[in-house]
Amino acid sequence: MESTITIENVVASTALATEFDLVKIMDSGLEGAEYNKTKFPGLVYRIDNPKAAFLIFTSGKVVCTGAKTINNAHKAITNLANKLKDIGCDKINLEPEIHVQNIVASADLKTTLNLNTIAIAFGLENVEYEPEVFPGLIYRVEAPKVVVLVFSSGKLVITGGKCEEDCNGGLRIVRKEFDNLGLLC
């Protein structure tokens, strides 16, 4: 049975302005915003539709995290840009260039795995497995450049992709490698 990925998190960044006055943004009554520069240099702002969280910095740069799709990350950033304009922020870029920094996806191979066997079969080149430190096997895929965390339950976490196809490619490679080793039913 073919496994499919589920996107769990998309992290994207952009520049919405050349600078932000974070205190002014807080004072404008941006509902749900948190800013304490002694704890963190950015303002944290969360929205529900689409669900996402933002880190907003004085440099005008913004990081969006928590979106479940690339499209939702774009929508969330566009909504934020309009909200910042509405509360009086100057020179907001309403059509910013958005860069996906990381996609985290999950998958289930629907079989249990012996991670010791996999670690021995793969050697030390692209694999790390230290069960005393971390219960998963870390498999670094060269192309696409992703990291796949493999758990004995057969569950996978794929991280480092810049697009959905990177994550799918990582899953295909892992499935093929495990199938070649006779590990998949």
From Swiss-Prot:
SUPFAM superfamilies, alphabetized: TATA-box binding protein-like (SSF55945)
GO biological process: DNA-templated transcription initiation
Pfam families: TBP
Sequence repeat start and end residues: 7-84, 100-178
Keywords annotated in UniProt: DNA-binding, Repeat, Transcription, Transcription regulation
Keyword Transcription: yes
Listed GO MF terms: DNA binding; DNA-binding transcription factor activity; general transcription initiation factor activity
Similarity remark: Belongs to the TBP family.
Function comment: General factor that plays a role in the activation of archaeal genes transcribed by RNA polymerase. Binds specifically to the TATA box promoter element which lies close to the position of transcription initiation.
PANTHER family for the chain: TATA-BOX BINDING PROTEIN (PTHR10126)
Stated name of the protein: TATA-box-binding protein 3
